[in-house]
Amino acid sequence: MMKQQFFLFLAVIVMISSVIEAGRGKEIMKNIKEKLTEVKDKMKHSWNKLTSMSEYACPVIEKWCEDHCAAKKAIGKCEDTECKCLKLRK
């Protein structure tokens, strides 16, 4: 009888520690999610700041714009941080 109570006691301790660890796991995942959200917001803010200055943004955007418009069979041109696709005449 004493052995059964001892093993039951150990099982309860293991279950309690598992529940505690599961709670910590959620806490850790929440912290990771918050950090990733902060990083995303900082990157978005930096990109918006960069693209607000057209003299810096156009060189960054231009290559993407050329490729984007080439897929549409057009010529890509960056104007005021916006990609303009000019249609090619046949």
Curated annotation (Swiss-Prot):
<keyword id="KW-0732">Signal</keyword>
<feature type="disulfide bond">
    <location>
        <begin position="58"/>
        <end position="78"/>
    </location>
</feature>
<comment type="similarity">
    <text>Belongs to the long chain scorpion toxin family. Class 2 subfamily.</text>
</comment>
<feature type="disulfide bond">
    <location>
        <begin position="69"/>
        <end position="85"/>
    </location>
</feature>
<feature type="signal peptide">
    <location>
        <begin position="1"/>
        <end position="22"/>
    </location>
</feature>
<keyword id="KW-0528">Neurotoxin</keyword>
<dbReference type="GO" id="GO:0015459">
    <property type="term" value="F:potassium channel regulator activity"/>
</dbReference>
<feature type="disulfide bond">
    <location>
        <begin position="65"/>
        <end position="83"/>
    </location>
</feature>
<dbReference type="InterPro" id="IPR029237">
    <property type="entry name" value="Long_scorpion_toxin_alpha/beta"/>
</dbReference>
<feature type="domain" description="BetaSPN-type CS-alpha/beta">
    <location>
        <begin position="55"/>
        <end position="90"/>
    </location>
</feature>
<comment type="function">
    <text>This recombinant peptide reversibly and dose-dependently inhibits the transient outward potassium current (I(To)) of rabbit atrial myocyte and prolongs the action potential duration of rabbit atrial myocyte without affecting the action potential amplitude. Thus, the voltage-gated potassium channels Kv4.1/KCND1, Kv4.2/KCND2, Kv4.3/KCND3 may be the target of this toxin.</text>
</comment>
<protein>
    <recommendedName>
        <fullName>Potassium channel toxin BmTXK-beta</fullName>
    </recommendedName>
</protein>
<keyword id="KW-1015">Disulfide bond</keyword>
<keyword id="KW-0800">Toxin</keyword>
<dbReference type="Pfam" id="PF14866">
    <property type="entry name" value="Scorpion_toxin_alpha-beta"/>
</dbReference>
<dbReference type="GO" id="GO:0005576">
    <property type="term" value="C:extracellular region"/>
</dbReference>
<dbReference type="GO" id="GO:0090729">
    <property type="term" value="F:toxin activity"/>
</dbReference>
<feature type="propeptide">
    <location>
        <begin position="23"/>
        <end position="29"/>
    </location>
</feature>
<keyword id="KW-1220">Voltage-gated potassium channel impairing toxin</keyword>
<keyword id="KW-0964">Secreted</keyword>
<keyword id="KW-0872">Ion channel impairing toxin</keyword>
<keyword id="KW-0632">Potassium channel impairing toxin</keyword>
